[in-house]
Amino acid sequence: MGNSDSQYTLQGSKNHSNTITGAKQIPCSLKIRGIHAKEEKSLHGWGHGSNGAGYKSRSLARSCLSHFKSNQPYASRLGGPTCKVSRGVAYSTHRTNAPGKDFQGISAAFSTENGFHSVGHELADNHITSRDCNGHLLNCYGRNESIASTPPGEDRKSPRVLIKTLGKLDGCLRVEFHNGGNPSKVPAEDCSEPVQLLRYSPTLASETSPVPEARRGSSADSLPSHRPSPTDSRLRSSKGSSLSSESSWYDSPWGNAGELSEAEGSFLAPGMPDPSLHASFPPGDAKKPFNQSSSLSSLRELYKDANLGSLSPSGIRLSDEYMGTHASLSNRVSFASDIDVPSRVAHGDPIQYSSFTLPCRKPKAFVEDTAKKDSLKARMRRISDWTGSLSRKKRKLQEPRSKEGSDYFDSRSDGLNTDVQGSSQASAFLWSGGSTQILSQRSESTHAIGSDPLRQNIYENFMRELEMSRTNTENIETSTETAESSSESLSSLEQLDLLFEKEQGVVRKAGWLFFKPLVTVQKERKLELVARRKWKQYWVTLKGCTLLFYETYGKNSMDQSSAPRCALFAEDSIVQSVPEHPKKENVFCLSNSFGDVYLFQATSQTDLENWVTAVHSACASLFAKKHGKEDTLRLLKNQTKNLLQKIDMDSKMKKMAELQLSVVSDPKNRKAIENQIQQWEQNLEKFHMDLFRMRCYLASLQGGELPNPKSLLAAASRPSKLALGRLGILSVSSFHALVCSRDDSALRKRTLSLTQRGRNKKGIFSSLKGLDTLARKGKEKRPSITQVDELLHIYGSTVDGVPRDNAWEIQTYVHFQDNHGVTVGIKPEHRVEDILTLACKMRQLEPSHYGLQLRKLVDDNVEYCIPAPYEYMQQQVYDEIEVFPLNVYDVQLTKTGSVCDFGFAVTAQVDERQHLSRIFISDVLPDGLAYGEGLRKGNEIMTLNGEAVSDLDLKQMEALFSEKSVGLTLIARPPDTKATLCTSWSDSDLFSRDQKSLLPPPNQSQLLEEFLDNFKKNTANDFSNVPDITTGLKRSQTDGTLDQVSHREKMEQTFRSAEQITALCRSFNDSQANGMEGPRENQDPPPRSLARHLSDADRLRKVIQELVDTEKSYVKDLSCLFELYLEPLQNETFLTQDEMESLFGSLPEMLEFQKVFLETLEDGISASSDFNTLETPSQFRKLLFSLGGSFLYYADHFKLYSGFCANHIKVQKVLERAKTDKAFKAFLDARNPTKQHSSTLESYLIKPVQRVLKYPLLLKELVSLTDQESEEHYHLTEALKAMEKVASHINEMQKIYEDYGTVFDQLVAEQSGTEKEVTELSMGELLMHSTVSWLNPFLSLGKARKDLELTVFVFKRAVILVYKENCKLKKKLPSNSRPAHNSTDLDPFKFRWLIPISALQVRLGNPAGTENNSIWELIHTKSEIEGRPETIFQLCCSDSESKTNIVKVIRSILRENFRRHIKCELPLEKTCKDRLVPLKNRVPVSAKLASSRSLKVLKNSSSNEWTGETGKGTLLDSDEGSLSSGTQSSGCPTAEGRQDSKSTSPGKYPHPGLADFADNLIKESDILSDEDDDHRQTVKQGSPTKDIEIQFQRLRISEDPDVHPEAEQQPGPESGEGQKGGEQPKLVRGHFCPIKRKANSTKRDRGTLLKAQIRHQSLDSQSENATIDLNSVLEREFSVQSLTSVVSEECFYETESHGKS
């Protein structure tokens, strides 16, 4: 009927019933919905009978994108609902049957009497054949017949069509067929009969004659002159749709007279019979038409002979059964090939017609309304072309698996089949004897699929929707010979394979494009950026609305040598140019209705614009087809107008709701209103998005500018902006994806795409489909499509007459290990265990003896994972499904003398007679006998002591388990975790069960157990297929050991298949190489570093060895960093000195320190000669003390890393320069020619950050493996605390830098003078920070002066004072942009001040009349050169202790600066560059186990004595790991092994030259004391500190390099008891040790100090033949000019016994 706007399109109803003599005539009523007053109607819907009622396949899979792969019949139940269906198209071209003419006739249904044009066609003398059944013809005969079989006199009148409206408001009508020759004979009573409402049920009441439909076989007397002219409205192109139409009218093969119809076989050749319906015989000849003695039992037999054309009409009959069932209204449908139908024309009586009705929503009769008849008929006469029709050899591509009828768009079926030899080929015929529905059929011939005439009619989409919406009442019987809707029977990838093999749609655009996914929809409809994917180049063709990606170039789709790599469905897409892309030009972004966003890069700007136009035009064409419109432009304009109205309405409603919300106080009502407002916001966003999309489509069709996206983005609601802000992309494309992610229909499509991917690769998006034929490894193992079809023939038939619901079903091939397999249909409700059971039953196997695993191809590796039995199969991601036999193995458990139980528990499943059916291992003790023999949780016991489990009852089982020895036969159940079993193993069997000589060695057996333990554990979920379990639980505990290695080896021999054992060995090798670099997170129970069956000694040994090995690797990496990058960069000019500082900073010191630390660790291990043979943890005691002592000794030194870590932000900035600086980039490329990421500068610079945070993890491992009551456990715990404090200190430094780094950089940049004294402030040089009150604030601060608090930062080079306004509303400066600018309102730092150390003084200041001991003064000295007056800051700490700490720290840097000026006048930066941090010491004495003193210190020291407290000024030299005098003493010296002349460490101890300073510095010498608690003592007359001060003044500084000490020295004041009187104590370096002395350790009396002075004088007067200048050593190593200055350092001397211990 050609209603281009109607929701149903009639292509011509078919006669589906047999002629029965004397049948009562029932008028045919066709009820057609959706006819509106202003809609234009097209004749195209009235197809001629050859294939007028062809159904589309229920093609939800392979052929779903091509409408006409196969047409199958449908017969439905009564009273079903009507579903909206897209318009079907058929072209009504008619023939005459005048004597002497070659035309068979023209349907009177389309005669000029009824207002229709008729078109005659002159055909050549050849057979136009059809090899594709349209599925809607009831002339079930498959032979060609000569034209002579129909005498000229047998022509008859065509039926007359009467159109009657059914209901005034319904818009529906009824079409009644009557004898076309006598319109006046239409019985009046027929018009009043109730309309029979069926779902396309060709009904035949008893004694009813079928109706001859508008078929090519219907004879008529119409003349060829009735053909329309080429300018007929039927042949016009649609108005205004030239851009969106895929081909105009002159492309179509149904053009002027003399051309063939686009659908081959639409017209019969002169030598062909009239394939009129067999129901069309006059009553007079009713006894002959079907030769009722039919011998055929089903129509399938008609197609078994390829030469059916030779049969006589009398030899072809419908079975009596068929006729009977039709007579009883059993709703059968059958069909035959279009052309293999003999004419059944007879003379005489008028033809009677049956009544047909279309489905409607209200199954009741409607009162006729004839008022609209004329207007409807007039509308039906209007014939116009359809926008987007395809050329004759093309076929439209349709989105697959769309579930809504309205989503299926239609296009004309084109393509002429000129294969003359194909006339005898018939489609694989589907016949059902008692079905209400027939599944789709498809041609066996591949060529037939591609080029057969394919039609559709108004029922197609309706029936498809019925298929999808049906829930029960499915009682179809399907022939085993059918392919059973092969379009659904293949996996999704195979569907796409076939689809793109057969697809011949119009290519709108093709070209090279770079492609990269950007955004996709993850779980819970959340948009996420795609994991970093590289740009890839493809040859992209736009076919219809699908982008096909090829890896090679072809001139057109027919020339493509390979199948497309993937396909991207671009339905309802928006394409936007991305000029702001930072790296590439000509980039555009495509977002589709699935919520996916993709980036493309075109070759030029013109190419980009062409792609945008092409995609938008294709989407517009598809949009028009889905809405059944022929005028795309008008449709889009109407849609735009409607959307504007909707936006206006919803905006008003939303405003009203907001007003209402402002006055409503009830919480429930407010919640409801808020939800409604949110819904309106989302609706508005969707409307705005659709409006923008329509305008984009209009712009592409009209050649205009694309709309401005500002108005669209302005419509985004606050939640949407927040979501896009989290995503990091605010653009039209991301907004479109967000809106689409909320759409339920798009989500359903996406879910279908995701769940029906079958063996798709992981990571391919729902709308981006990969194809099976590409990059498929092991393709020879995959069944071909034809093999899958054959399997479907075998296994695809439904059981018990109930069909599968193929709409959501995936046909998947399941592999078995014998290289065979089966195809099973996976439904959404199928779990893993269901698929396993189904596959095993198809192979007659016992499912309980098999497991299911998924094979995935990741890069070049094959990964296996075993899903849990209860998980849904369609939710898995895999390439192949494999069923593998579970491993059966025997275990003999025997209790020895000390073992009282086996160490496992069982769960039994029993029947009602208390007989066992199954026994499972429910628990296994990790260190029990059963575990050692290979029993694992979840294994199933098959036999007990040779007795089958099924033959036992509970009592017998308990009796057997109570015996001393029990023999078990077990099945190893697969794990329920989806952990990857292995990667990239070979298929060769390295270990075979019958090759005992190839068993892995015992240590590999243990390692295999470790891995098997990880993935052989099961939870109760494994037994989800055991619903009712009565438990006979036997739980026991044991302390047995693994002493039966032979049994274990036997178990390993049979425990895993060869492939898995190979993989496990390889996996272990990988894990060994990786070591402990990452904590294991996937293990359950909680992670431990090694498997439980290893002894504690083995685990300790492994962790210690790993600590040393990784330390070696780390030191090697740092060395490579210096050799590859640091040293060569110093000779280059493209990095400034500041940038070099940022990049490398304290790395030289760090490297030297790490070398020393590594040597310390190695010394500790080498001291334990039996390290590899220790058997118990207690034997590791000495070694663990050594390791713990090393960490304690160097804990503060690790704070070197704080500066480096804080500077890592700068590192990123410097490395960014490589993108713009070609010279820098060339340098980096030259350093890393192999392009390995591990060798890049960025990779090397991150290693220190990773390493320093790794130490606490390793120490935690050691702590967990020691006895909690042991001394080494306490010792390691203290070391762990120390390293955790280091980590927290590093984090604190980073936080300070983030908060105040802006200020530090600004102050450095704002320094006055030609040469800046402070070029950089590194966080590694931050010694202390504290908050103080400012007692004399500047007047310029105004109101802020009251109670003003400053933060004091003490660096090695300067002191900084900062006042930060505590206002949360003010934003601080971003740390990544730090320009020098004046203080503004946005700047929270209202005051900042930098005092270089050269202009710094500090003094204690108590204002007169105050008793506050917490006040002190910081002085910025005046400078005449810079014209700077003296500035005094009066500061007050919170308590005297805080004051003491900060003043100590400032004094220490002043001493450091003084020494530097005295020695060489070198600036600090130069000395820092030349200084290498630690002396290469041997093992610290504190780490020596036998030292009674160190043990005593360890036992008596509290935890906070191991490391200095950060906030109290104890981190004086964090850049060098040392602590200056007065903050941290050196409690643990090291035995001096050898001196390294390069190792210097200035600035550690009090400078004796301080005595020469002004009195105001000396008088406060209590501050300089080494006592940590000296700050508690005030300056009093006669105090011990005063005595020390006097002695300092008397000390002489020895600068004579020729004075050498003798070997015989006086013992130091702290010499040990066992030291000989004349023996020189060993000089050790102890200033790194964080273990503090006791508070009274340096409170000397006057006699002690005098003795020290005498001893110092004796040192200076030693003979000159000594080889060591002790003073020079002290000066070089400890930055002190005389030994006298360190007489109070008790730990500098120790007994020889300590050194040897």
Swiss-Prot record:
Identify the stretch(es) annotated as Disordered: 1-21, 201-250, 265-293, 389-417, 1070-1092, 1500-1556, 1568-1628
Output compositional bias ranges, type Basic and acidic residues: 397-413, 1596-1607
Molecular function in Gene Ontology: GTPase activator activity; guanyl-nucleotide exchange factor activity
Q: Where is the lipid attached (N-myristoyl glycine)?
A: 2
Q: Which PANTHER family match?
A: RHO GUANINE NUCLEOTIDE EXCHANGE FACTOR TIAM2, TIAM (MAMMALIAN TUMOR INVASION AND METASTASIS FACTOR) HOMOLOG
The protein's job, in short, is: Modulates the activity of RHO-like proteins and connects extracellular signals to cytoskeletal activities. Acts as a GDP-dissociation stimulator protein that stimulates the GDP-GTP exchange activity of RHO-like GTPases and activates them. Mediates extracellular laminin signals to activate Rac1, contributing to neurite growth. Involved in lamellipodial formation and advancement of the growth cone of embryonic hippocampal neurons. Promotes migration of neurons in the cerebral cortex.
Would you identify the family this protein belongs to, as annotated?
Answer: Belongs to the TIAM family.
Instruction: Please give the name of this protein.
Output: Rho guanine nucleotide exchange factor TIAM2
Q: Which organism is the protein's source?
A: Homo sapiens
